[in-house]
Amino acid sequence: MQIFVKTLTGKTITLEVESSDTIDNVKAKIQDKEGIPPDQQRLIFAGKQLEDGRTLADYNIQKESTLHLVLRLRGGMQIFVKTLTGKTITLEVESSDTIDNVKAKIQDKEGIPPDQQRLIFAGKQLEDGRTLADYNIQKESTLHLVLRLRGGMQIFVKTLTGKTITLEVESSDTIDNVKAKIQDKEGIPPDQQRLIFAGKQLEDGRTLADYNIQKESTLHLVLRLRGGMQIFVKTLTGKTITLEVESSDTIDNVKAKIQDKEGIPPDQQRLIFAGKQLEDGRTLADYNIQKESTLHLVLRLRGGMQIFVKTLTGKTITLEVESSDTIDNVKAKIQDKEGIPPDQQRLIFAGKQLEDGRTLADYNIQKESTLHLVLRLRGGF
């Protein structure tokens, strides 16, 4: 078949290849045509640097695909690698070297196997397939080398079907790594996995240690449903925004999507569904929000205000609130202060009993207004 190779100068080379050709073979063909030695060639496809021993088929490169050719600059540069013991190693590298290559050089110098090496630069753990240039690592930059402890530990992953999977991991494993291990065992693609621990959704780039996940901890695996769905968000101005979401999206995710569309910072957004204010860490599925559901968006006014709540005993409680707070929210704040369950609270303002789903603004309750708290007797009606 024919494929194309585009150089940084904009020139396009046409090559006759077979799916079974290795990247080495392709580089040799480029050398025949253009005279560029293979060791100065880097080939990129779909944003990935191609490895010499792999075949075109491995990368799903098909007829008339276009590869990009980047030249490795000769001459390279020096970088430093500092270990936890304080020792500094000097390496000769090129910007186009991958993190794998750098780990191999460290192994040559120090004898530490690459799979026990974690490299950190500017507070970020470096991923094997990326290059030094990708991370803007320049001459005389210093990387930090942290060793992965051997031996690791076992953790458990519980699925919604109740099945428990046992994994061999290390504290330094990233959530990506854990998802890859789950894929190896269960065949579930990482992009369909959501991992939850202590009520928090775990982010791919972080490590188990970051979340204080220790041996024999149990994570919960929730599947992201493919395909997603549309929901609507209605603002107080009457405008309706359409969002593409999945049931497994958290309310945080939804607020981020609204920010992308409308530019409203998440901390100024309050989302209401079925009269309830939605909490950031929960998912759409938690609230039974289904396709074509409509959420209501209320803006939080900056700064908030104080109001007073007077009880029948004559005690006055001061609360920090915002106009956009619902009566539910106010009852929750009273519970936090006084320990009275919301279902035993009745709030009265201007002679009116206040309804849970409404906001302070709905009742024209302003700063330093006084509400009256009456307790509902148990068993009553």
Curated annotation (Swiss-Prot):
Residues 1-76, 77-152, 153-228, 229-304, 305-380 form the Ubiquitin-like domain. One of its GO terms (molecular function) is mRNA binding. Residues 381 form a propeptide. GO terms for cellular component: cytoplasm; nucleus. The keyword Glycoprotein does not apply. Keywords: Cytoplasm, Isopeptide bond, Nucleus, Repeat, Ubl conjugation. It is found in: Cytoplasm; Nucleus. It comes from the Eukaryota. There is a cross-link at K48 (Glycyl lysine isopeptide (Lys-Gly) (interchain with G-Cter in ubiquitin)). SUPFAM superfamilies: Ubiquitin-like. InterPro entries: Ubiquitin-like_dom, Ubiquitin-like_domsf, Ubiquitin_CS, Ubiquitin_dom, Ubiquitin_ubiquitin-like. The keyword Nucleotide-binding does not apply. There is a cross-link at G76 (Glycyl lysine isopeptide (Gly-Lys) (interchain with K-? in acceptor proteins)). Ubiquitin exists either covalently attached to another protein, or free (unanchored). When covalently bound, it is conjugated to target proteins via an isopeptide bond either as a monomer (monoubiquitin), a polymer linked via different Lys residues of the ubiquitin (polyubiquitin chains) or a linear polymer linked via the initiator Met of the ubiquitin (linear polyubiquitin chains). Polyubiquitin chains, when attached to a target protein, have different functions depending on the Lys residue of the ubiquitin that is linked: Lys-48-linked is involved in protein degradation via the proteasome. For the sake of clarity sequence features are annotated only for the first chain, and are not repeated for each of the following chains. Belongs to the ubiquitin family. This is Polyubiquitin. It comes from Pisum sativum (Garden pea).
